[in-house]
Regions:
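Bacterial N-terminal signal peptides that target proteins for export
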Residues: 1-9
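Interaction/scaffold regions that mediate signaling and macromolecular assembly across diverse proteins
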Residues: 24-279
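Bacterial N-terminal signal peptides
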Residues: 8-17
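Sec/Tat signal peptide C-region and signal peptidase I cleavage site
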Residues: 19-23
């Protein structure tokens, strides 16, 4: 089984083209963000983001993909969201402990993504917001629109140069939301030092047990492109990927994965995760 599955992974990886470049970035540490204070007891207030999520995220949604009411966000909520983002950027995040930092970066990424969509709505896909530098760049991920401790950062920086290399926790992929139907769910809760572990576990379980994550379709294993783009985060090969899926799979899926010996296909739905978008 291992040889067949690995061969499928390799073939698929070779097929990933330039169109997916922003999603296939390597984890490359930005050393200055390693600074932290393990003795700090300071807590960051994410209540504004929590309130926004409860008001504007539809969860659960019949499709199994949490949705955002982008077109229904009130002017007051828009203003509060921008104030929250300004407050996060004003923090000296290096003075906080690792748990507070992890929640901070996840919330910053998600809140800023939502703000980008709202400010440019209506859009059919986040990839239509072409503000990243570079001739082949697509989407907003490379645009350095945030300023933290005097440094300009992009969404790509947060994901690939801070969160992934510092924490080395593949569940981060289930926490970051790219405003698309193919993404793991945007949780209706803000991350915090106290709830991050539970939310990361919840996100992994929800995604893997939904068809956009992992599913068997007509004797073919269909998985999210996340597992191709970021295969290195999930281990050294097909066996590690399978072990990861089985760890979170419900009994029926886990049993099917254990017996599976076929090929693999991957895809990703970049349509906006708005309330009106049909699956």
């Amino acid at each position: 089984m291992g040889r067949i599955f690995t061969r499928a992974i390799v073939v698929i990886t070779m097929l990933v083209g330039a169109d997916w470049a922003q999603a296939a970035s390597k984890a490359e540490l930005w050393p200055r963000w390693q600074k932290h204070d393990p003795n700090s007891r300071q807590q960051i207030d994410h209540s504004v983001w929590e309130s926004f999520l409860k008001q504007n995220v539809v969860a659960p949604h019949p499709s199994g993909v949490n949705r955002v009411r982008y077109d229904g966000v009130s002017p007051e909520d828009q203003k509060s969201l921008k104030s929250y983002l300004q407050a996060l950027q004003a923090l000296a995040i290096s003075n906080y402990n690792r748990d507070e930092q992890k929640a901070y970066w996840i919330n910053l990424y998600n809140a800023f993504t939502v703000d980008l969509i709202i400010s440019r709505f209506p859009v059919a896909s986040i990839r239509d917001i072409n503000i990243s530098p570079g001739l082949l760049a697509r989407g907003p991920w490379g645009a350095k629109l945030l300023t933290i401790e005097g440094e300009k950062l992009s969404l790509d920086d947060i994901e690939h140069r801070v969160l992934r290399p510092i924490w080395r926790d593949n569940r981060v992929h289930y926490a970051l939301n790219c405003a698309s139907l193919g993404c793991p769910n945007l949780q209706p809760r803000a991350y915090s030092a106290g709830n991050s572990e539970a939310l990361l576990e919840k996100g992994a379980r929800e995604f893997i047990n939904h068809p956009r994550g992992v599913s068997l379709q007509k004797d073919k294993l269909q998985v999210s492109s996340i597992y191709v783009w970021f295969q290195e985060d999930f281990g050294h090969g097909a066996a590690d990927l399978m072990e990861h899926w089985q760890e979170y799979a419900e009994p029926a899926l886990a049993g099917a994965l254990e017996k599976y010996q076929g090929g693999l296909a991957h895809d990703y739905d970049w349509r906006l995760n708005g309330v009106e978008t049909k699956p």
